[in-house]
């Protein structure tokens, strides 16, 4: 008789868990940001924009040097080129980390 009671109790517990799981929302909304805060997407977009600006400035400086514009030194061109290169490499590493994090999350068991 105790097996029947334990089984009934187990079934009641399972039904209660099922009802609780069905009543909770499947997805949660993103938290609201306080005024003055920026989201990760905004910060990433700003970083991409800065890398683009650095590359554009480097390219313009190199073009100015190539056509012989006065006031443009080779050292300035090389420094701008290296800054653009380093910023692009950093952005590439951030992208690689994001892709790896996404893949790790997708491979997690449910």
Swiss-Prot record:
Pfam families: FliE. Keywords: Bacterial flagellum. It comes from the Bacteria. One of its GO terms (molecular function) is structural molecule activity. GO terms for biological process: bacterial-type flagellum-dependent cell motility. Its main location: other. InterPro entries: FliE (IPR001624). It is found in: Bacterial flagellum basal body. One of its GO terms (cellular component) is bacterial-type flagellum basal body. The keyword Chloroplast does not apply. Belongs to the FliE family. This is Flagellar hook-basal body complex protein FliE.
């Amino acid at each position: 008789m105790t097996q029947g009671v334990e089984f009934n109790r187990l079934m009641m517990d399972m039904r209660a868990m099922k009802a609780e799981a069905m009543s909770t929302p499947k997805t949660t909304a993103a938290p609201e940001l306080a005024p003055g805060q920026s989201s990760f997407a905004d910060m990433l977009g700003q970083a991409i924009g800065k890398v683009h600006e650095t590359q554009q400035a480097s390219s313009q400086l190199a073009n100015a040097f190539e056509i012989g514009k006065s006031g443009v030194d080779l050292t300035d061109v090389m420094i701008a080129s290296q800054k653009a290169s380093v910023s692009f490499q950093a952005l590439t590493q951030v992208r690689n980390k994001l892709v790896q994090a996404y893949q790790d999350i997708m491979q997690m068991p449910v």
